[in-house]
Amino acid sequence: MVLHPLFAYPTVLLALGVFALYIVSLLKLRGMMKYALYLNVVLIVFALLSVVFGFGISNVPLVQSKVPFIWEFPHKWNGVFLFVLSVLTFVVFWFKGETAGKKLALLPVLGLLLTFFQFFTGWMLRLVFFS
């Protein structure tokens, strides 16, 4: 059963929301931090499931024969890195909390950039696979 798309799309949307909430909470509204932390827990679960099912689908022979390496390799390992970054972001902001400085806004900005790159490579894989 192919469950990667079921978890991948919510993961991208959650990542955009969580990292945007972290940026907003660091720059303007400090009260948004708790919502970002709660959603980050959900993001970690969805990202883990996306990575696990993504590795599962990459072992299917049809996928291996149709998907070019130039899109599969960065998509696969960027997904793992996005999962690790979401865990790292949660740990950092869980311990720092309200005392986090504005310099830590670089961590969610990096998360947003990785999320956009993950969405782009996934979309290109989809276009290549279904063409």
Name the predicted role of every residue range.
Residues M1-S131:
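Polytopic transmembrane helical bundles with strong interfacial aromatic enrichment
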